[in-house]
């Protein structure tokens, strides 16, 4: 029987394979208890074209003294930042790679904020 983490990693692997077959740039999300990370990765997976996370110094200042990066409000902020950085790099359309995480809570907040900021997926 697979552990919860092994199940998530298996789902993540399958998603990465499907996105690679499509040959499009992907927006990948990773979350921990304290932070959330988003990266835009090239079609072949060799380069990170844009990234944003709650671990960045500028974001931590915006979050305030508490530095809470593990909530939905912080995820929305990261969604907007990653969309702005991707658009600055000339990327309008991506495939959303949620890395096996459920499309709920922080992952959903990040995705919806990125869509509102103009990223298409």
From Swiss-Prot:
Coiled-coil annotated spans: none
GO MF, one annotated term: structural constituent of ribosome
Entry keywords, A to Z: Ribonucleoprotein, Ribosomal protein, RNA-binding, rRNA-binding
Family membership: Belongs to the universal ribosomal protein uL18 family.
Subunit structure: Part of the 50S ribosomal subunit; part of the 5S rRNA/L5/L18/L25 subcomplex. Contacts the 5S and 23S rRNAs.
Highest taxon of the lineage: Bacteria
Protein task: This is one of the proteins that bind and probably mediate the attachment of the 5S RNA into the large ribosomal subunit, where it forms part of the central protuberance.
Protein name, per record: Large ribosomal subunit protein uL18
Gene that encodes the chain: rplR
Gene Ontology biological process terms in this record: translation
Organism: Paracidovorax citrulli (strain AAC00-1)
SUPFAM superfamilies registered for this protein in UniProt: Translational machinery components (SSF53137)
Cross-referenced Pfam families: Ribosomal_L18p (PF00861)
The keyword Electron transport is annotated on this UniProt entry: no
Keyword Transferase attributed: no
GO cellular component term of the entry, any: cytosolic large ribosomal subunit
């Amino acid at each position: 029987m697979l552990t919860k983490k092994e199940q998530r990693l298996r789902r993540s692997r399958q998603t990465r394979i499907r996105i690679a077959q499509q040959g499009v740039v992907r927006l990948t999300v990773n979350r921990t208890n304290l932070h959330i990370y988003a990266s835009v990765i090239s079609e072949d997976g060799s380069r990170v074209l844009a990234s944003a996370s709650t671990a960045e110094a500028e974001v931590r200042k915006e979050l305030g003294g508490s530095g809470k990066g593990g909530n939905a409000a912080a995820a929305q902020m990261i969604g907007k930042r990653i969309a702005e950085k991707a658009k600055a790099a000339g990327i309008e359309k991506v495939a959303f790679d949620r890395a096996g995480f459920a499309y709920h809570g922080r992952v959903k907040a990040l995705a919806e904020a990125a869509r509102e900021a103009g990223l298409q997926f």
